[in-house]
Amino acid sequence: MSVTPNPDQHVAQLIDANLDRAREGLRVIEDWCRFSLKNKDMVITLKNWRQQLGKEHYEIYKNARSSSSDQSAGLSHPAQKERILPQQILSANFARIQEALRVIEEFSRISHPKLSKISAQIRYEIYDLEVIILKISNLNMLDEKLKSCKLCLITRTHPELIKTVLLALKAGVTMIQYRCKETPDNQMIAEAKELASICKSYNSLFLINDRADIALAVDADGVHLGQKDMPIQTARKIIGHQKIIGLSTHSLEEIQNATSQGCNYIGIGPIFKTKSKQNDLSLGIDFFSKINLKTNLPWFAIGGINKDNIDKIKEVGIKRVAVINAIMGAEDPYLASKELLGKLKK
């Protein structure tokens, strides 16, 4: 096809610049899908879009290029320095692609209708792809955080709840589970919102105990369920597949069932007698020597764990623990967290 030359060279420059912008943005997303998501189908789709645009990137546009005389070339924006997470980079590049395609679509409609049509088609399809890729990327990021987590703090009602959690995060705790069973909903939401914001600033996971609705309302990273709470499938319908779900288990049978139900991690216990669940029988240390044979999910030992017994449980292969009173009941939550983490990392 021959392109009808546009008498206005500025339009040719504009199309050239936006073709470059769209193709570069597509390459950023493509490489993320290739190296991080390892999704061959997405890579093929994105590569095909790049090539479609490349075939229509005629010399008439490249010859009109004037980067050296463009006074706006190379302009930066303060927001660029704030893109520290992959999701932020992806979102910025999706927006870049969509905006560039819209400009191409508008200015090539008369002189290059084929390019205009291609740009419109890609733009509409990439809106849906953006949602899918960001959801998958978010879940992958949460899973990686989960796997690297050593210590989870489960909260309880406390007069200095926010301060205690903040001290734990400063000490290096990377997962907080908000658990306040007797707290009214309006107070739970207020506290959960503040905790979610704090955890985000420390790049730590934040989950809500039992309440998938509140987890969704405050944009928590997920929800932790007990055996008598709503089914995992129901929780998935509420919070979606881009969030993580944990499940409490108390026997080998429950551990095996959890693996097939679609949760992301499990809590196993109580390993010792605990103040929070005084009527539950403890599993004992020997029970945990069998766990790795039964599940590939990340799992946390829970129940009565403290600085005095944590060395014993490490001897049977326990790598992750969840605690309540060992930190929430400590005189110095910061030092208590540091001591537990130090023992876990030995």
UniProtKB/Swiss-Prot annotation:
Species annotation: Prochlorococcus marinus (strain SARG / CCMP1375 / SS120)
Metal-binding found in the keyword field: yes
Physiological role: Condenses 4-methyl-5-(beta-hydroxyethyl)thiazole monophosphate (THZ-P) and 2-methyl-4-amino-5-hydroxymethyl pyrimidine pyrophosphate (HMP-PP) to form thiamine monophosphate (TMP).
Tree of life domain: Bacteria
Binding site for Mg(2+): D210, D229
EC number of the protein: 2.5.1.3
Keywords on record: Magnesium, Metal-binding, Thiamine biosynthesis, Transferase
Protein name: Thiamine-phosphate synthase
Pathway where this protein functions: Cofactor biosynthesis; thiamine diphosphate biosynthesis; thiamine phosphate from 4-amino-2-methyl-5-diphosphomethylpyrimidine and 4-methyl-5-(2-phosphoethyl)-thiazole: step 1/1
Region (Thiamine-phosphate synthase): 126-346
Region (Unknown): 1-125
